[in-house]
């Protein structure tokens, strides 16, 4: 669910990365601009206008993704003039081994890493040294991590995940070539900041692996309701920038939130507000949908992700 144009070098003339409404020649961004209060709610619009304040992606990494960082809100305002940074959450939907590489993520500087050393690794393009600066963390289906602005990170090969984040595409990359061998343009490394100021975006506070896991791995909270179970994956105690639930419906359930949300159907089939839904369907639910009626087919319990904007 995206209202944010992708920033891709050499493709600036192409509008891409935007969610489109099925059956209409219309993007979600256009719909929100046309009917902001009906879609997002008056309270949200008063604070964020027609911006939903959230961006959601599905990522399937066939190779390790390049090491990178995103700015905090403070740095985004200072360096890009943006009220949003790019804090994000990863929820692992599935994993697989690729060419002997077990699924993993890289997150946070190890103790003792300095800005000078990190810049040296970049300018010499010593990729093994870069990887050695970060903690390598094995992951499995169901794991969740909050990746705050300023924290260096990377997604390993074989990870299929949902990424929910602040609505920007500010990504500072430190690898000039992808593991597959594709060149990374200068602008895709520094996003216009240059090869010095880009390093202002990193938080150089090193930590032990135990500290990294304590700060950034998230434990879901389970809530049992009539006809369904909610796993609150990202909730206000983790961040107020966005929220994410995993919903399992085994019969009939009525869900409410008082705000807009989005849905990705992962498993099963049934009815959503009287309309058929099935695996791989995606929906945007306007703020006016205060009570959401969901019914699972008898032999196909529904499992879907439901995500929300700023809380």
Locate each region found by the language model.
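Loop-centered beta-sheet repeat module
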Residues: 122-174
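Short histidine-centered beta-strand/loop micro-motifs
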Residues: 57, 67, 78-81, 252-257, ...
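Ligand-binding loop in jelly-roll beta-barrel domains
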Residues: 59-64, 72-73, 95-98, 151-170, ...
């Amino acid at each position: 669910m995206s209202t944010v144009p992708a920033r891709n070098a050499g493709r600036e003339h192409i509008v891409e990365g935007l969610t489109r409404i099925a059956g209409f020649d219309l993007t979600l961004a256009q719909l929100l601009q046309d009917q902001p209060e009906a879609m997002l709610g008056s309270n949200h619009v008063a604070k964020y206008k027609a911006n939903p304040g959230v961006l959601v992606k599905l990522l399937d990494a066939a190779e390790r993704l390049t090491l990178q960082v995103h700015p905090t809100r403070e740095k985004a305002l200072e360096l890009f003039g943006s009220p949003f940074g790019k804090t994000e959450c990863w929820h692992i939907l599935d994993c697989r081994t690729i060419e002997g590489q077990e699924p993993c993520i890289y997150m946070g500087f190890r103790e003792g890493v300095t800005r000078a050393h990190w810049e040296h690794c970049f300018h010499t393009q010593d990729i093994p040294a870069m990887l050695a600066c970060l903690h390598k963390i094995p992951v499995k289906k169901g794991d969740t991590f909050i990746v705050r602005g300023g924290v260096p990170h990377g997604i390993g090969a074989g990870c299929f995940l949902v990424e929910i984040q602040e609505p920007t595409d500010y990504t500072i990359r430190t690898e000039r070539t992808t593991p597959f061998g594709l060149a990374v343009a200068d602008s895709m490394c520094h996003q216009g900041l240059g090869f010095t100021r880009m390093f202002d975006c990193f938080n150089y506070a090193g930590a032990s692996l135990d500290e990294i896991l304590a700060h950034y791995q998230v434990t879901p909270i389970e809530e049992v309701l009539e006809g369904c179970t909610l796993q609150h994956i990202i909730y206000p105690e983790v961040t107020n920038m966005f929220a994410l639930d995993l919903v399992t419906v085994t019969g009939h359930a009525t869900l409410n939130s008082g705000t807009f949300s989005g849905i990705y159907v992962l498993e099963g089939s049934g009815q959503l507000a009287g309309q058929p839904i099935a695996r791989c369907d995606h929906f945007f639910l306007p703020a006016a949908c205060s009570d959401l009626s969901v019914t699972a087919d008898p032999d196909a319990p529904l499992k879907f992700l439901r995500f929300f904007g700023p809380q």
